[in-house]
Structures are given as C-alpha cells and as structure tokens.
UniProtKB/Swiss-Prot annotation, chain B:
<dbReference type="GO" id="GO:0000139">
    <property type="term" value="C:Golgi membrane"/>
</dbReference>
<feature type="topological domain" description="Cytoplasmic">
    <location>
        <begin position="25"/>
        <end position="32"/>
    </location>
</feature>
<feature type="transmembrane region" description="Helical">
    <location>
        <begin position="150"/>
        <end position="168"/>
    </location>
</feature>
<feature type="topological domain" description="Lumenal">
    <location>
        <begin position="111"/>
        <end position="116"/>
    </location>
</feature>
<feature type="topological domain" description="Lumenal">
    <location>
        <begin position="169"/>
        <end position="178"/>
    </location>
</feature>
<dbReference type="GO" id="GO:0015031">
    <property type="term" value="P:protein transport"/>
</dbReference>
<dbReference type="GO" id="GO:0005046">
    <property type="term" value="F:KDEL sequence binding"/>
</dbReference>
<keyword id="KW-0812">Transmembrane</keyword>
<keyword id="KW-1133">Transmembrane helix</keyword>
<keyword id="KW-0813">Transport</keyword>
<dbReference type="GO" id="GO:0005783">
    <property type="term" value="C:endoplasmic reticulum"/>
</dbReference>
<feature type="transmembrane region" description="Helical">
    <location>
        <begin position="33"/>
        <end position="52"/>
    </location>
</feature>
<dbReference type="Pfam" id="PF00810">
    <property type="entry name" value="ER_lumen_recept"/>
</dbReference>
<dbReference type="GO" id="GO:0005789">
    <property type="term" value="C:endoplasmic reticulum membrane"/>
</dbReference>
<dbReference type="GO" id="GO:0033116">
    <property type="term" value="C:endoplasmic reticulum-Golgi intermediate compartment membrane"/>
</dbReference>
<feature type="topological domain" description="Lumenal">
    <location>
        <begin position="53"/>
        <end position="58"/>
    </location>
</feature>
<feature type="region of interest" description="Interaction with the K-D-E-L motif on target proteins">
    <location>
        <begin position="47"/>
        <end position="48"/>
    </location>
</feature>
C-alpha cells in the first residue's frame, strides 16, 4: 500500500 | 525520483564525505560531536536493515552501503583512530534523552507494528534529533571550524530538500508519509538557528560563532 512506496527513499 | 530528492541525497552524501575528509586529512576530530555520529550510525543501521532483503535499485542499494560504511568509519575515526583529538569535555549532550523517547514513540506511533517498521520509524524519529549533540557542542565551544559549518549546512539542507520532495510526491504521486514529514519538519526547524548564522556569517567569510 501507500506506505511501502515510501521505503524507496533513503 | 525527483530533483528535490536527488539534490537532497547529493547534499547528504557530500556532508558525509566532507566530514570524513575533514577528519582524515586534518587527522583530527576537534569540534566534532562523536555522540551525533554514533546516533547517525544507529539511524542508518536501523533504517537499512532491509538492505539485503529488499532490492529497490542499484542507486538505492549503493547509497545505503555508502551511508552505513561511512558512518561507521567516522565513528571509528572519532573513538579509535583519532580519539586523542576527540573533545569529550564539550561533547556532553545526554543522548539517552534522545534515544529513549524516540524508541518509545516509535512503538506508539508507527504505520505497522512489525519489527522492521518499528525500527524504521525509530530511525526516522532519531534522525530528526541526532544533530542536537553537535549543535549543543558548537554552542558550548562558542564556535565551529568553517569546514564543520559547511558539513552542518549540507546536512541540514538535505532534509529541507526532502520536504520539497514530499510536496512533489504528494502533488504528482498521491504519496505522503506523515511520520517522515513531521520528523523532517522537526529536523529542519532545529537547523534554522544555524542556517541563519551560516548565511549571515560564514558566507561572508567570517567564522561561525554562536552566542555561548
């Protein structure tokens, strides 16, 4: 979900 | 990826390199807070545990490896290689007052109650206050070497650029992560005082001196 996308940030 | 995030990562990377080179070249960590560097090593360790399990891109993986390796190298230089030059008397911020509250908060406020997610959340909260021992040390010594102020400026600007990255991602990717945004705002606000001094003093060729 949305939050998983965030984990592409350093 | 967008320009703000890319510039933010470059700024973060250059801050880390500036610090590494400053200590290595001058063979001294005078004016550098070992406690802040320890906190950064904890931040990267707890945030990048998925380094080997979750491949996102070559860029992402290589930057994570560089961040973790350089933070440990910096801690090693401060507490081992050049420990004779470590100014422990001025590096007295009580880091337990940063680690304990952020650890508790990461259990209370997170996106998912799983070990990886709680550790990631802890690393986000801790990063937002990790610079405090360094800023405290600069205010205690009353001044900072120019190279150290460039390091701090690059480090502060990185998260400021990330704030613009989150505005961009909200606008164009319908994405936002409130935990990262709030922590990023706190982190940037902590630098405001320093940004003001940096722009009004260091950019005019003067030495950075804080009212002690």
């Amino acid at each position: 979900e949305l939050d998983d996308i965030g984990k592409d940030e350093l | 990826m967008n320009i703000f995030r890319f510039l933010g990562d470059i700024s973060h990377l250059s801050a880390i390199i500036i610090l590494l080179l400053k200590i290595w070249k001058s063979r001294s960590c005078a004016g550098i807070s070992g406690k802040s560097q320890l906190l950064f090593a904890i931040v990267f360790t707890t945030r990048y545990l998925d380094l080997f399990t979750n491949f996102i891109s070559f860029y992402n993986t290589s930057m994570k490896v560089v961040y973790v390796a350089s933070s440990y190298a910096t801690v090693w230089m401060i507490y081992s290689k050049f420990k004779a030059t470590y100014d422990g008397n001025h590096d007295t911020f009580r880091v337990e007052f940063l680690i304990v509250p952020t650890a508790i908060l990461s259990f209370l406020v997170n996106h998912d109650f799983t070990p990886l997610e709680i550790l990631w959340t802890f690393s986000i909260y801790l990063e937002s206050v990790a610079i405090l021992p360094q800023l405290f040390m600069v205010s205690k010594t009353g001044e900072a070497e120019t190279i150290t102020s460039h390091y701090l400026f690059a480090l502060g600007i990185y998260r400021t650029l990330y704030l613009f990255n989150w505005i961009w991602r909200y606008q164009f990717e319908e994405f936002f992560d409130l935990i990262a945004i709030v922590a990023g705002l706190v982190q940037t606000v902590l630098y405001c005082d320093f940004f003001y001094l940096y722009i009004t003093k260091v950019l005019k060729g003067k030495k950075l001196s804080l009212p002690a």
